[in-house]
């Protein structure tokens, strides 16, 4: 008898719930009229962001390091190219102190005689990117500096002395 009563109450409850009206969804808020207001930089008008970033990214074997970039014509041209898409190229060891590879495009160069340090990202001959894990003195255009932990960690990241790597540059 109790079981029959419980089934009856449950059935009545289910039927009652089926007859409830759909929940009322409040109106979505109206967009504010921004006429005459200053643009705070948060609109999505579709305009391309042309501010110069402070860093780009270098990815090797699925691991990424930031590169603090210089403010020069080469980096401006590189960032402009990276706004379109990332750039992937092959780099190989050279001289026991660097990985070098052709970028696949020419960048403006402003070569000066410099002594590189581990972590430097350098433009060579206008179209090659050099990633240093040692030092060298030559006439280069500085792109930036990889932000890394220890020298040993940088060498592992770049697979120093282990031949060809695939490098991806991105924003």
Spans of features found by a protein language model:
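N-terminal secretory signal peptides
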Residues: 54-96
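Glycine-rich active-site loops that engage anionic ligands at enzyme catalytic sites
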Residues: 86-171
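Sec-dependent signal peptide recognition
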Residues: 1-8
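Short linear motifs in intrinsically disordered
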Residues: 35-51, 78, 111-113, 119-122, ...
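Bacterial Sec-dependent N-terminal signal peptides
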Residues: 8, 13-51
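Short, charged N-terminal helix-start/capping segments
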Residues: 42-61, 100-102
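Preference for short coil/turn "hinge" residues that link or interrupt alpha-helices
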Residues: 8-13, 62, 66, 96, ...
């Amino acid at each position: 008898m109790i079981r029959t009563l419980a089934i009856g109450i449950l059935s009545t409850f289910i039927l009652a719930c089926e007859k409830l009206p759909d929940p009322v969804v409040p109106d979505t808020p109206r967009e504010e009229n921004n006429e005459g207001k200053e643009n705070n930089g948060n609109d999505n008008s579709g305009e391309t962001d042309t501010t110069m970033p402070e860093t780009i990214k270098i990815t090797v074997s699925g691991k990424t390091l930031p590169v603090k970039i210089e403010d020069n014509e080469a980096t401006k041209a590189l960032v402009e190219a990276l706004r379109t898409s990332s750039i992937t190229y092959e780099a190989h060891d050279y001289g026991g102190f660097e990985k070098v590879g052709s970028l696949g495009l020419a960048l403006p160069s402003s070569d000066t005689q410099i002594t590189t340090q581990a972590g430097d990202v350098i433009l060579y001959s206008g179209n090659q990117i050099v990633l240093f894990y040692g030092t060298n003195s030559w006439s280069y255009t500085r792109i930036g500096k990889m932000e890394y932990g220890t020298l040993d960690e940088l060498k592992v990241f770049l697979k120093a002395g282990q031949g060809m790597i695939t490098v991806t540059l991105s924003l």
